[in-house]
């Protein structure tokens, strides 16, 4: 399958394939470049979607590094803000001259995995906040790293980015990997009855810019 942007082909190195992915987003039909990457650990995989306009070749890309969330991204759980953040990020990415989504499905629950996330949710039902719940089940508060995301950005040829995130730790982690974050662009979403305490905890205890 061919397009003006890229040809579908099996690739060498540590990324496995690329193609054109047609999607429907908010009433628009878009054709995005899609690449699948494989990290050193076979469980560490990433899907990269690139939106580029003809005049965007020399722009600094707007980038979202998004941790996978089965409950939020797929089932639209109201307990977190993952789905509305992903939607807001995709809107910005697909209306920018050059935008990139790096989707990391292995980072479920800030890296603690799906089962531990549900265990932590059960404790939150008993009154724990998201930080204390992780501690109570013996899981890290934050278990993610961004070396694969940084590798992807360098592989794509974009060591300088504008990052869509509320999380200053993500900014610093990418900088430690050598990525120059020129600007942090917040993703502000409206809290719901179900996630307002979660968002307050992220702001007060994890320094998120909300």
Sequence positions of predicted segments:
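Catalytic domains of riboflavin
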Residues: 1-210
């Amino acid at each position: 399958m061919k397009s003006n942007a890229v040809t579908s082909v099996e690739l060498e190195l540590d990324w496995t394939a690329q193609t054109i992915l047609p999607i429907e987003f908010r009433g628009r039909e878009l054709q995005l470049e899609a690449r699948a990457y494989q990290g050193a650990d076979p469980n560490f995989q990433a899907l990269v979607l690139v939106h580029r306009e003809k005049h965007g070749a020399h722009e600094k890309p707007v980038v979202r590094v998004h941790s996978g969330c089965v409950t939020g991204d797929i089932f639209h759980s109201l307990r977190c803000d993952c789905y509305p953040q992903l939607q807001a990020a995709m809107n910005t990415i697909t209306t920018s001259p050059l935008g990139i989504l790096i989707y990391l499905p292995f980072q479920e629950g800030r890296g603690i995995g799906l089962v531990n996330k549900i265990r932590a949710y059960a404790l939150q039902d008993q009154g724990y906040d998201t930080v204390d719940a992780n501690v109570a089940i013996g899981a890290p508060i934050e278990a993610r790293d961004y070396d694969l995301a940084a590798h992807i950005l360098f592989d794509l040829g974009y060591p300088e980015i504008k990052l869509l995130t509320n999380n200053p730790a993500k900014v610093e982690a990418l900088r430690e990997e050598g990525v120059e974050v020129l600007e942090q662009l917040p993703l502000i979403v409206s809290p719901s009855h179900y996630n307002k305490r979660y968002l307050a905890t992220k702001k007060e205890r994890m320094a998120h810019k909300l």
